[in-house]
Amino acid sequence: MATVMELKATARPKSGKGAARAERRAGRVPAVIYGNKQPPQPISVEEPELRQRILAGRFLTTIFDINLDGKKHRVIPRDFHLDPVKDFPIHVDFMRLGEGATIRVSVPLRLLKADVAPGVKRGGTVNLVTHAIDVECAAESIPQFIEADVGALEISHSLHLSDLQLPPGVKPLAREDVTLVTIVPPSGYAEELKAAAAAGAAAPAAGAAPAAAAAGAKAPAGGGDKKK
């Protein structure tokens, strides 16, 4: 069950660029609630609180209850914009969630047992190819993260989407069996493999020469005179 957070907001009587700039000058962030077959509702949120929510992480997968004039709106953020220079929030889009709604979200991947993976112990490096997985699930069941166990990976081996144990009711959107994690070989690993292969091939050849010489010494001498 996803955790539902409270978020304070006030209704905006006006929309448009001029009204939005006025909200920002007053220390509030203009936003809108839309969806669920209802008209859009312009709102504003206190900038410090909203910035704290965004910086806390997983903002786009967190469900919020917004109370407006005594009516509670259950929403999820679908998009937000930051000031390109000062990096503070300047607008947020919230989508209403109806009862039993399903939603598509991008859930971050969390690695397990990376430090005990055989490939890591042999000097390899964990390469996180896919940082998040796009899934579909009930809005009330959005996982905070999806776990990926890499504890058995060797050097040059990979973990794919089909290797994951997804939570019940969570379905991946990707049709391909995408690569999630790989163990990158350490520097010089390819040369070590070539040297080991060459040494392995040379060993049987070196052992064959003395054996051939010994066999020749035991063979009877040919070409001698026969008794008549």
Swiss-Prot record:
A biological-process GO annotation: translation
Keyword Calcium part of the UniProt annotation: no
Signal peptide: none
Region (Disordered): 1-24
Keywords assigned by UniProt, alphabetized: Ribonucleoprotein, Ribosomal protein, RNA-binding, rRNA-binding
Cellular component GO terms, alphabetical: cytosolic large ribosomal subunit
UniProt-listed Gene3D superfamilies: Ribosomal protein L25, beta domain (2.170.120.20), Ribosomal Protein L25, Chain P (2.40.240.10)
Keyword presence, Hydrolase: no
Function as written in the Swiss-Prot or TrEMBL entry: This is one of the proteins that binds to the 5S RNA in the ribosome where it forms part of the central protuberance.
Family: Belongs to the bacterial ribosomal protein bL25 family. CTC subfamily.
Subunit details: Part of the 50S ribosomal subunit; part of the 5S rRNA/L5/L18/L25 subcomplex. Contacts the 5S rRNA. Binds to the 5S rRNA independently of L5 and L18.
Protein name per the record: Large ribosomal subunit protein bL25
Source organism: Nitrobacter winogradskyi (strain ATCC 25391 / DSM 10237 / CIP 104748 / NCIMB 11846 / Nb-255)
Name of the gene: rplY
